[in-house]
Amino acid sequence: MEKKRILVIDDDESIRKLMAHMLELEGYQVDTAATGNEAIQKTKSNFYNLAIIDIRLPDMEGTALLTLMQDTVPKIVKIILTGYPALNNAIDAVNKGADGYITKPIIDNAGFLRKIKDHLRKQDESNRYNEEKVAEFVESRIKQLDAKDV
């Protein structure tokens, strides 16, 4: 099975390294970015299953990056990471396309990893469902075309 790819976007190098290390130990392939623009460039040239996005980046707000990513890579799972755990931040992030919301510092490593795994599992289920629906449509269409040829 192919490794899931995760992009960690945070201007704090120690947080990027810590998250990358934790996720790599779980078997994920991890890439990092320090700015929103760097993240956008990486998503243009690489495929990622999931992005963890700090809410405050040096060149843009994490919620602005959410909107950009929603337009350029809509299928990527987007999780906002924040040291500012306020309800209005969570609501704003979800309204702009976040699939999840994690507060830092991350105290419960197992809980953090479980959230990542759950989001990736849901993504897999959604992809399988979509593939099944496409296959059903193609099969149905072939039968319709075959019936016309008879």
Task: Please name every model-derived segment.
Residues 41, 63-75:
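Short amphipathic alpha-helix used as the core "switch/output" element in two-component signaling
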Residues 17-25:
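Charged docking surfaces used in two-component/phosphorelay signaling
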Residues 16, 58, 82:
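The feature encodes the CheY-like receiver
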Residues 4, 35, 61-64, 85:
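Acidic catalytic/metal-coordinating carboxylates
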Residues 121-150:
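CheY-like receiver
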Residues 54:
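Active-site residues of response regulator receiver
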